């Protein structure tokens, strides 16, 4: 039982004195299923509230796995307690035992909707605008709180092979991009909203951030010492490029086994903004869509669109007309 002022989530405190939860407090309230997924910092379960029978996502961080894991858990808790937005997966409950952190979040079940869309053979501009608009509004909200997500991306499966080989393969034929890694449909309804998840790498922007994180393709900071909110807008430009064309904007034709030269060449292209709107994949894409991608992937951070500016770009009205 927590002493003192009641906490909105479990018994987590960051003061000098800690009142840890007993593991039984977690299992008394929730049924934890089998592991759904193991990630770099945590294990993910489906959990059922024993009283309401409502299903949640549970993320378990093991303290014994090291300082980075403990930092990731604390960071995700801190950020998620600050935010409330319809396009951000909400934190419901938190417990800290002596050995673990347990985070209970809303359960998003709609990844299969991406499969349905990609089964049609392409991701239309209208489909893409529906995704990008919602994510952009969430990112603009985060940025208003000076929060940088730093890890917006699509899954690496398949992408690394396209990037590594330099072969331009369209997404449906290649079977990649079955879902966005931390951008998911909330449910399986046709008009489901999009939600952002995974905030363990997010950071409060107190001045410019120094340490790089995330995937180089989405972070044009590989050669920069400091960066901030513009990095999320760059990432959204990369995501928009991939959704519209089925291909990554940056790839290198160096042999897969020549990792050092491959990485150098890829990073050079990212830093130079060296990408093209390749035919035939971009032949039927509107000029306004290409304009938004270009403004989001502007190498000069000072010239790059902010999330709020991107929301007002003409592309959205062009698609809706």
Ranges and model annotations:
Residues 60-83:
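Conserved N-lobe beta3->alphaC-helix segment of eukaryotic protein kinase catalytic domains
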Residues 131-132:
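Activation segment signature within eukaryotic-like protein kinase domains
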Residues 221-230:
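Conserved end of the kinase activation segment
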Residues 33-40, 44:
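Protein kinase glycine-rich loop
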Residues 43-63:
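Glycine-rich ATP phosphate-binding loop
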Residues 93-94:
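A short, aromatic-enriched beta-strand patch in the conserved N-lobe beta-sheet
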Residues 298-321:
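Terminal C-lobe "cap" of eukaryotic-type protein kinase domains
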Residues 99-112, 116:
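Conserved short submotifs of the Hanks-type protein kinase catalytic core
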């Amino acid at each position: 039982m927590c002493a003192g002022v009641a906490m909105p989530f479990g018994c987590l405190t960051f003061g000098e004195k800690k009142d840890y939860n007993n593991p039984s407090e977690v299992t008394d309230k929730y049924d934890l299923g089998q592991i759904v997924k193991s990630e770099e910092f945590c294990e993910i379960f489906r959990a059922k509230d024993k009283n309401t029978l409502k299903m949640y996502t549970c993320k378990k961080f093991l303290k014994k796995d090291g300082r980075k894991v403990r930092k990731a858990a604390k960071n995700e808790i801190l950020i998620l307690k600050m935010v409330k937005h319809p396009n951000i997966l909400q934190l419901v409950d938190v417990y800290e035992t002596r050995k673990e952190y347990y985070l209970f979040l809303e359960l998003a079940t709609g990844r299969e909707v991406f499969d349905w869309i990609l089964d049609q053979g392409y991701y239309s501009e209208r489909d893409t605008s529906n995704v990008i608009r919602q994510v952009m509004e969430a990112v603009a909200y985060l940025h208003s709180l000076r929060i940088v997500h730093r890890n917006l991306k699509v899954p690496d499966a398949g992408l690394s092979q396209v990037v590594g080989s330099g072969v331009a393969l369209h997404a449906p034929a290649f079977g990649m991009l079955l879902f966005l890694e931390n951008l998911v449909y909330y449910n399986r309804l046709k008009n489901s909203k999009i939600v952002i998840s995974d905030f363990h790498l997010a950071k409060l922007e107190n001045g410019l951030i120094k340490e790089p994180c995330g995937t180089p393709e989405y972070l044009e900071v590989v050669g920069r010492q400091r960066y901030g909110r513009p990095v999320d807008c760059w990432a959204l430009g990369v995501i928009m490029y991939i959704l519209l064309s089925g291909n990554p904007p940056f790839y290198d034709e160096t042999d897969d086994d020549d990792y050092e030269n491959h990485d150098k060449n890829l990073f050079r292209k990212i830093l130079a903004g060296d990408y093209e709107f390749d035919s035939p994949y971009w032949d039927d894409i509107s000029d306004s869509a290409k304009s938004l991608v270009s403004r989001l992937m502007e190498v000069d951070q000072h010239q790059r669109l902010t999330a709020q500016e991107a929301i007002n770009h003409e592309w959205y009205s062009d698609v809706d007309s």
